Amino acid sequence: GITEVKKISDMAHAYDVGIQVHCAGSPLTTNAALHLECTLPNFLIHEHHTCNRMDTSVGLTKYNLQPENGYFTVPDLPGIGNEFLQEAIDRATLYKVIE
């Protein structure tokens, strides 16, 4: 989780090692990664995967963060600054894991 990555990053910083958060998921992971990266003095680069530009990803959340001129604007909204759209939740496939 976010707290564990922060701990690992702090240890890496003590040894002058840079950090790049692997972020190849949904728009929510982009928000979480951006907020985390803002706290890391040893942050190097943000990974923005092409899956975050696909229609299936763009339609998942209220806000669609994309870089502009190579930079992101980190939202100052509550939490990680984004939320799933109810329509995306309604069309999600449900799986029953345990009887």
Where are the language model's segments positioned?
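Shared catalytic-loop signature of beta/alpha-barrel
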Residues: 1-71, 75
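C-terminal extensions of enzymes
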Residues: 59-99
